[in-house]
Regions:
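Structural beta->alpha junctions
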Residues: 35-39, 46-57, 91-96, 173-178, ...
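Short amphipathic beta-strand/extended segments in non-transmembrane regions
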Residues: 32, 47, 51-123
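Alpha-helical transmembrane segments
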Residues: 1-38
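Extended serine/threonine-enriched, polar tracts that run as long, contiguous segments within proteins
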Residues: 44-45, 212
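Membrane-interface segments of envelope glycosyltransferases acting on lipid-linked substrates or membrane lipids
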Residues: 10, 66, 78-80, 194, ...
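Short, well-ordered beta-to-alpha junction loops that form the rim of enzyme active sites
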Residues: 34, 80-83, 161, 173
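Mid-to-C-terminal secondary-structure elements
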Residues: 108-122, 133-234
């Protein structure tokens, strides 16, 4: 696969792109930010891997600029950020609960994962830029926890494993596909199995205290007619 440096960020960090064909189908370019390594033995002797700063991340503005420059080839980015595992407990019935894994995602991530919406809406760019406390939950979680009630517009409170409590408003329900999330543990009762709850990725950064404005790892999504090699040569 080809690798190309698209920009120099800060003084010691460079962004590289590796052209790949994603296993889920469709053209993607997997991107990551890493330090520029020393070129000589003398430099290696005193070199220390630098810490990331806000200026080192690939910003949303950079991504938007790339999409604007190549609208026929680039459709967006898919990125995720693990916020934590936790539990939602019905305040009126402690026996009614749901275990979730909170993932911060970009608006394009559900399409990237080939997940279809069941009800409501997906997360939007406005949700992301506004760092809104909204979420999209799995249909199987919605059916069990809300017991037939419409979950759209409902507020849920998640207590994470480290004791943090996060409140979100449900704006959408996606169709859960176990094949896309890996094997299940048959020893765990179905009621206790965790499902992924998606929130805006910028919201997840803020809740973690980092409040970073950019991305360290992401998948650049290319249109069906785009050529991967040509895209990485821009």
């Amino acid at each position: 696969s080809s690798v190309i440096i698209i920009t120099t960020i800060g003084g010691s960090i460079q962004s590289t792109l590796t052209a790949t064909m994603n296993s889920l189908g469709g053209n993607t370019v997997s991107a990551y930010v890493q330090a520029r390594y020393p070129e000589t033995d003398d430099e290696w002797e005193t070199w220390i891997y630098p810490e990331m700063t806000d200026e080192d991340y690939v910003s949303q503005e950079m991504i938007d600029g790339l999409i604007a420059a190549y609208p026929d080839e680039v459709s967006g980015i898919a990125a995720e950020n693990y916020l934590g595992g936790g539990q939602i407990v019905d305040p009126k019935d402690s026996d009614n609960y749901a275990n979730v894994v909170i993932e911060g995602i970009t608006p394009e991530y559900l399409d990237f994962m080939k997940l279809d919406m069941h009800a409501g809406r997906s997360l939007t760019a406005a949700d992301n830029s506004g760092k809104k406390r909204v979420c999209v939950i799995a249909d199987i979680m919605a059916e069990r926890y809300f017991n037939g009630r419409d979950p759209i517009g409902e507020q849920i409170s998640v207590t994470t494993s480290d004791g943090s409590i996060f409140d979100f408003v449900v704006v959408g329900v996606y169709e859960y596909n176990q094949a896309l999330f890996g094997k299940i543990d048959p020893t765990i009762p179905e009621k206790d199995r965790s499902t992924q709850m998606m929130v805006p990725i910028q919201t997840s950064f803020k809740l973690q205290g980092s409040d970073q404005a950019g991305y360290e790892y992401f998948n650049l999504l290319l249109t069906p007619l785009a050529d991967v090699d040509q895209a990485t040569n821009h």
